[in-house]
């Protein structure tokens, strides 16, 4: 399915763990790494496409993750000319337009399975620091990755603040019940990522 401008509608998926690292996947038979992504089928809405791709590419079901955020706008990248296929029987696809989702893995990482499809997209994966993919992805996707990660960084910062607030609340409640204990000093949580200072 290609739109009138030549872009294929697509979903992209960033999966994080509780330490703020993100899942980085190696494309099958290649020395190329990226986030899971895939096209939207006719009749699917964006969220349905995301959960289908999530299972097909990394073997995770809806129950294995928590949806933290979905980007509100389409982000586009053009393919290099060498990758554009000029097939007379089909419209020419010049690139992808993507909606991105931020998910947190709530299941054990053993649930990740790259072999759920007969034609696997990936043959390896690992956890990497939050900003690592922006520097390492192929150049024509870099601007999209930078925009996505800047948006998602704000979401994860908010999640960390919630965790810190809940810990402080629990400490205060415990101290109130047992007055011989003092409230634990507030500790600054170690940030799982650094602020990217590259070009916008």
From Swiss-Prot:
Q: Report the protein's function.
A: Accelerates the degradation of transcripts by removing pyrophosphate from the 5'-end of triphosphorylated RNA, leading to a more labile monophosphorylated state that can stimulate subsequent ribonuclease cleavage.
Which residue ranges does the UniProt annotation give for the motif Nudix box? 38-59
NCBIfam families named in the record: PRK00714.1-1, PRK00714.1-4, PRK00714.1-5
Q: Which organism is it from?
A: Glaesserella parasuis serovar 5 (strain SH0165) (Haemophilus parasuis)
**Highest taxon of the lineage:** Bacteria
Q: Which GO terms describe its cellular component?
A: cytoplasm
Which GO BP annotation is one of this protein's? mRNA catabolic process
Query: Which molecular-function annotations from GO does this UniProt entry contain?
Result: mRNA 5'-diphosphatase activity
Q: Which family does it belong to?
A: Belongs to the Nudix hydrolase family. RppH subfamily.
The molecule here is called RNA pyrophosphohydrolase
Q: What is its EC number?
A: 3.6.1.-
* Residue segments, region Disordered: 161-188
* Coiled-coil regions listed in the entry: none
Its taxonomic path starts at: Bacteria, Pseudomonadati, Pseudomonadota, Gammaproteobacteria, Pasteurellales
Q: Which residues form the Nudix hydrolase domain?
A: 6-150
- Cross-referenced InterPro entries: Nudix_hydrolase, NUDIX_hydrolase-like_dom_sf, NUDIX_hydrolase_CS, NUDIX_hydrolase_dom, RppH
């Amino acid at each position: 399915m290609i739109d009138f401008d030549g872009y294929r509608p697509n979903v992209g998926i960033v999966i994080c763990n509780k330490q703020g690292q993100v899942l980085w996947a190696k494309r099958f038979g290649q020395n190329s790494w990226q986030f899971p992504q895939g096209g939207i089928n006719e009749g699917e809405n964006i969220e349905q496409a995301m959960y289908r791709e999530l299972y097909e590419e990394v073997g995770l079901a809806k129950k294995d993750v928590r949806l933290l955020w979905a980007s509100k706008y389409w982000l586009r990248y053009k393919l290099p000319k060498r990758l554009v296929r000029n097939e007379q029987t089909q419209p020419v696809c010049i690139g992808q337009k993507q909606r991105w989702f931020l998910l947190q893995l709530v299941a054990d990482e053993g649930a990740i399975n790259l072999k759920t499809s007969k034609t696997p997209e990936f043959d390896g994966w690992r956890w990497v620091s939050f900003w690592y993919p922006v520097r390492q992805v192929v150049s024509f996707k870099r601007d999209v990755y930078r925009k996505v990660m800047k948006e998602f960084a704000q979401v994860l910062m908010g999640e960390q603040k919630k965790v810190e607030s809940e810990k402080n609340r629990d400490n205060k409640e415990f101290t109130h019940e047992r007055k011989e204990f003092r409230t634990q000093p507030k500790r600054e949580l170690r940030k799982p990522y650094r602020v990217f200072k590259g070009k916008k």
